[in-house]
Amino acid sequence: MQIFVKTLTGKTITLEVESSDTIDNVKAKIQDKEGIPPDQQRLIFAGKQLEDGRTLSDYNIQKESTLHLVLRLRGG
């Protein structure tokens, strides 16, 4: 199924995923497309931050859902 990931810059990334994919998997796909390391990614859906070990179906994320990607930058 397709889901969308919207970044803070307003860019929308389209990902091909399965309901059984973990949030880890999704972050890895985002890394493939955007080059953003998973440890800097925070994914938000319906106002909740998504935890790495959970699956998309745990959060009731269905096809064409939009997730929001927030970057967690290391404090310098």
Swiss-Prot record:
Alphabetical GO CC annotations of the entry are: cytoplasm; nucleus
Xref: PANTHER family: UBIQUITIN
Q: Where is this cross-link: Glycyl lysine isopeptide (Lys-Gly) (interchain with G-Cter in ubiquitin)?
A: K6, K11, K27, K29, K33, K48, K63
Tell me the residues linked by Glycyl lysine isopeptide (Gly-Lys) (interchain with K-? in acceptor proteins).
G76
Q: Say what the protein does.
A: Ubiquitin exists either covalently attached to another protein, or free (unanchored). When covalently bound, it is conjugated to target proteins via an isopeptide bond either as a monomer (monoubiquitin), a polymer linked via different Lys residues of the ubiquitin (polyubiquitin chains) or a linear polymer linked via the initiator Met of the ubiquitin (linear polyubiquitin chains).
Q: Which Pfam families match?
A: ubiquitin (PF00240)
Listed A to Z, the keywords are: Cytoplasm, Isopeptide bond, Nucleus, Ubl conjugation
Q: Which domain of life is it from?
A: Eukaryota
Name the record gives this protein: Ubiquitin
Keyword Metal-binding applies? no
